[in-house]
Amino acid sequence: MLENIKQTITRWDERNPWTNVYGLARSIIALSSLLTLLINHPSLIMKPASGISSYPACKMNLSLFCLGENNYMMLNLFRWVCIAILVLVVIGWRPRITGVLHWYVSYSLQSSLIVIDGGEQAAAVMTFLLLPITLTDPRKWHWSTRPIEGKRTLGKITAFISYFVIRIQVAVLYFHSTVAKLSQQEWVDGTAVYYFAQEKTIGFNGFFQALTKPIVTSPFVVIPTWGTLLVQIVIFAALFAPKKHWRLILIIAVFMHEIFAVMLGLISFSIIMAGILILYLTPIDSTIQFTYIRRLLWNKKHKKGEVSV
């Protein structure tokens, strides 16, 4: 056993966990929160709710939005502070610094916003689990693909352990979601999507109700209902699947969440889950080349050069 541990540590020491894979994931997660704050004024996302007379609720709460006076002018100021931090995260500046700030912003949003889709909760958990990776990341930009100089064995061990904990957490999340659904008769008999479509808060709008009515009101409704369960089971099983299957599972999983975004309006949640799934289903020590984007930028630059000549 000790020999296996030694071999694992040796393999980790030869690999690099600080790549643009986790950089892309945290940028996408931050982008979702950034869009939420840019689009919505505090008066829309921080207000009294059922059972809460004043908002944000700050009893035993360390949220950023609870550090000042409870009025919308102060809350709006804090909103812009969060926006500034999230912009730094999205562009990838100093993960070692912005990693902690990103978690605190995510925690503050999860604690203070009136949300119904669970995206902020997922972001708060994931940014916390990313802390051991960000705090040991020596790069100035999390997009950098340059080799890391120097021997950083302890930092690499810490980062890889955190990565595997994240993968287990994501797998458990989908496993728990599947089990919870299977405890409800609507999911077992295949009619759950029909009820979701009719739900007034996050149900289909008039366009999608008309578009999907032939399926949702027919026996074929079992296809999207059981299909959702099947995809979630596959995502959980990806924890044990060979890496060669990860990309296909990632495409299927992200596609499922984007359907949720379009049809149910779960845009914030779906963007956050896309970032989490990239982290879950892409080897952290690999490098995303962004070949198409580089080619596009190069062609534009080359064309400008031709014009100037």
From Swiss-Prot:
Subcellular locations according to the entry:
Cell membrane
Membrane-crossing residues?
Answer: 28-48, 73-93, 113-133, 157-177, 220-240, 259-279
- Signal peptide limits: none
User: Chief localization class?
Assistant: membrane
On the tree of life, the source organism's domain of life is Bacteria
The reply to whether Amino-acid biosynthesis figures as a keyword in the UniProt entry is no
Keyword Translocase listed? The answer is no
Q: How does it sit in the membrane?
A: Multi-pass membrane protein
Mind listing the UniProt keywords for this protein, alphabetically?
Answer: Cell membrane, Membrane, Transmembrane, Transmembrane helix
What does the entry list under GO cellular component?
plasma membrane
What InterPro entries does the database record attribute to this sequence? HTTM-like (IPR011020), Sporulation_SdpB (IPR023894), Sporulation_signal_mat (IPR052964)
**Sorted alphabetically, which PANTHER family does this protein's record hold?**
HTTM DOMAIN-CONTAINING PROTEIN (PTHR39535:SF2), SPORULATION-DELAYING PROTEIN SDPB (PTHR39535)
What name goes with this protein?
Uncharacterized protein YitO
